[in-house]
Design a protein with these regions (language model features):
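Periplasmic N-terminal accessory/gating domains of Gram-negative outer-membrane beta-barrel systems
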Residues: 1-68, 79-81, 85
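C-terminal beta-signal and adjacent terminal beta-strands/loops
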Residues: 424, 476, 522, 530-555, ...
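Outer membrane beta-barrel strand-and-loop segments of large Gram-negative receptors
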Residues: 245, 249-255, 295-308, 389, ...
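Transmembrane beta-strands of outer-membrane beta-barrel pores
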Residues: 67, 84, 100-102, 111, ...
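Face-selective signature of the C-terminal outer-membrane beta-barrel domain
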Residues: 151-169, 191-337, 353-355, 412-415, ...
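Predominantly transmembrane beta-strands of Gram-negative outer membrane beta-barrel pores used
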Residues: 60-71, 77-85, 92-138, 145-153, ...
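Gram-negative outer-membrane beta-barrel transporters
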Residues: 315, 420-422, 441, 446-539
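Surface-exposed extracellular loop regions of Gram-negative outer-membrane beta-barrel proteins
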Residues: 176-181, 224, 278-285, 356-400, ...
Length: 653
């Protein structure tokens, strides 16, 4: 429900903020970066189907769509700072969740007798494959995740904690469908099976003193992604796709916060670490009119370093505040990226309470983000890191933001904010001259192509929001965003032109309305309705798509990039509702919930599917009029249109 966040129409958990892609957001848990937030993540593009983070374990969440803290780097569109609560210091507490599509257990407990060391943990497992099988969907996902925090108070001024977050995911094809329709056949034709796992383990030490605090965090994360597909989905036949990759990071950061330095507040720190990427790929490709097998192996390691500082002060009885920040990042990946002065990231935030209940705020900043591992580690057929040779650089984004907020009382807030984002040095594919962050939701990796850092873009718009935490015992959130998201279409020589075209996230309109009401007898009803303007799309290249070698390589149609995003789908909207009932007993409580997504079964007409006709045995039919081509047909395709009901019980003790 946050302003400027696009809700996708295909049951995904992608966070698309103010016209930026899902890979432009960064997430932190207790000060430790979380590179993979979602199950079934798209490598190089972030996003995914469901969040790994169990919100029951969180104490607070700060979501920044601008004016990012200097301590948190490597993001272009948003930063989410999540903080976990500590475990219960006096007694064991637990919670069981048994739903129609998942199971979970949470517990928090003292570990030491004096309660100074506590443990908070959760484990969840989905069995969506059962629900999806009943619904006749062509893929059957299963995911598991775990999360924990071990916290210890070493004294009045010192604290130590360990955190962990991880997942194990498996998505297999539903090849047992009886009489699959064309839509199901199409998905079964191109979608590979997928195994993913990820983990983040980190440790933090906090020392508090009279004038501030010192925090040191160390962490390691890893993400493993395996994709494979067999001819005709028959596992006795050879694999046509065999993709195995692992990426990992080791990180350390130290920061000091001083609450009063001559009336100023100062935060500063340093950090460093290393990154590692391994990739073994075997996949079909269609180039130069020939079907071939693309093979490459890549191993990459490099170092990172960062430096940041923030200085802030309040004036005029705390009515006016100023914050100055500076950050610099660098890596040993290449000469283009090793000098942190090239990635100097200044920022200025202003806030002025010019009248009671009225506040004006503004910020201007430059942010930098590393290109995805898939681009950094891509090698050509001779083993050369081709993108390193092409001068791959950090992606840059300049933000200009201003807004006014009115706070009539302690429960409500009304605000309007305008934003302008300017992108530069975006990696552009040498294959289709498009930014590597683009790609439809059928893509399972993004960025593993030859690129050059020549892309430019812009996103701008205005947001209006209203929030009331006690409107007739109801929490109400309403937000509307009007935006444009575009990139500069390079010319044939990849030089910038004056032509701007819509990005994949140029939806123009975003409307979110949500409410949670508490009734008597411990009933709670929540509802969320959201509307997203029509997404742009690119027409198919019929001639290329129908070529037998081209279709056999991809099992999907090819786009006519000369007409990139020149068409637009209709708007999408959806209503989700949830009802909860709780019964309280002496030492435990029982809860029951019903959750329904897409209550009124709205279906949006998507881009038609272009696919070959098949004969009675399921083989593609050649076009007798065009040798070397398949006979093609179009199939209507709806986005959404699935009511997802679930119910469950919770037991807390």
């Amino acid at each position: 429900s946050a302003p400027g966040v696009i809700a996708t129409a295909i049951q995904r958990n992608d966070v698309l903020v103010r016209g930026g892609g899902a890979n432009e957001n960064k997430y932190y848990l207790d000060g430790i970066e979380i590179p993979v937030l979602n199950h079934f993540a798209v490598q190089g593009g972030s996003g995914g189907n469901a969040s790994l983070v169990n919100t029951d374990l969180l104490r607070s969440v700060n979501f920044y769509t601008g004016a990012f803290p200097a301590a948190f780097g490597n993001g272009l569109s948003s930063v989410m700072d999540m903080r976990m609560r500590d475990g219960n210091p006096t007694r064991f507490k637990g919670k069981l969740i048994l739903g129609a599509s998942d199971f979970g257990i949470n517990f928090d407990t003292p570990v030491s007798r004096n309660g100074k060391t506590t443990l908070l943990a959760s484990y969840r497992r989905s069995y969506l494959q059962m629900l999806f099988s009943v619904l006749g969907l062509p893929f059957l996902p299963t995911y598991n995740d775990y999360q924990f925090k071990l916290a210890s108070k070493l004294g009045a001024s010192d604290e130590f904690y360990l955190i962990g977050l991880g997942s194990f995911d498996y998505n297999r094809l539903n090849t047992g469908l009886k009489d699959p329709d064309d839509d199901q056949k199409y998905i079964l034709g191109y979608l590979p099976e997928n195994r993913q796992s990820s983990y983040v383990f980190g440790a933090g030490y906090v020392h508090r003193f009279r004038a501030g605090q010192l925090r040191v965090v160390v962490s390691r994360n890893a993400f493993t992604n395996k994709l494979y597909k067999h001819e005709r989905n028959d596992k006795s036949l050879p694999r046509t796709i065999d993709y195995n990759t692992e990426q990992s990071d080791n990180r350390v950061r130290a920061e000091i916060e001083l609450r009063s330095v001559g009336g100023f507040r100062f935060t500063g720190g340093v950090g460093g670490g290393s990154g590692h990427y391994d990739n073994t790929t075997r996949r079909p490709a269609y180039t130069g009119g020939q079907l071939r097998t693309e093979r490459f192996d890549s191993r990459l390691s490099f170092g990172r370093y960062e430096l940041f500082a923030t200085l802030s002060r309040e004036f005029f009885g705390k009515r006016f505040s100023v914050l100055l920040g500076l950050r610099a990042d660098g890596t040993t990946y290449s000469s283009e990226m090793h000098n942190p002065l090239r990635q100097l990231s200044p920022r200025l935030n202003l806030s002025y309470n010019f009248r009671p209940q009225w506040t004006f705020s503004a910020s201007v900043a430059r942010y930098y983000q590393e290109p995805p591992y898939t681009s950094m580690g891509y090698r050509d057929s001779t083993g050369v890191l081709i993108n390193k040779a092409n001068g791959l650089r950090y992606i840059a984004s300049d933000h200009f933001i201003a807004g006014i907020a009115f706070t009539p009382d302690a429960h409500s807030r009304i605000s309007v904010e305008g934003f302008y984002k300017r992108y530069s040095d975006y990696p552009v594919s040498l294959i289709d001259s498009l930014p590597v962050s683009t790609g439809d939701f059928a893509d399972y990796t993004i960025g593993d192509v030859p690129v050059r850092s020549v892309g430019k873009g812009r996103a701008y718009g205005v947001e209006l929001s209203y929030r009331n935490t006690n409107l007739a015992n109801t929490v109400v959130n309403v937000s509307y965003t009007f935006l444009h998201s575009q990139f500069n279409r390079p010319g044939a020589d990849l030089r910038p032109t004056d032509e701007y075209v819509s990005s994949d996230w140029d939806v123009r309109h975003i409307l979110n309305v949500s409410a949670i009401h508490k009734f008597g007898r411990n009933w709670t009803l929540g509802a969320k309705w959201y509307l997203t303007g029509g997404s742009p799309f690119t027409p198919y290249d019929f001639g290329l798509s129908s070529q037998t070698g081209a279709w056999d390589a991809r099992q999907r149609p090819y786009y006519d990039y000369a007409l990139y995003n020149s068409r637009r789908l209709q708007a999408f909207h959806q209503l989700d509702v949830r009802a909860d009932k709780v019964w309280y007993f002496a030492k435990w409580r029982l809860g029951f919930y019903v959750d329904i997504q897409n209550l009124y079964n709205f279906k949006a007409a998507g881009q038609d599917i272009l696919m070959p006709e098949t004969d009675a045995s399921g083989q593609y039919v050649p076009d007798p009029q065009r040798p070397g081509h398949y006979k093609m047909k179009t199939v209507a395709h709806d986005i959404g249109g699935t009511v997802l009901p679930t119910l469950g019980i919770t037991v807390e003790f």
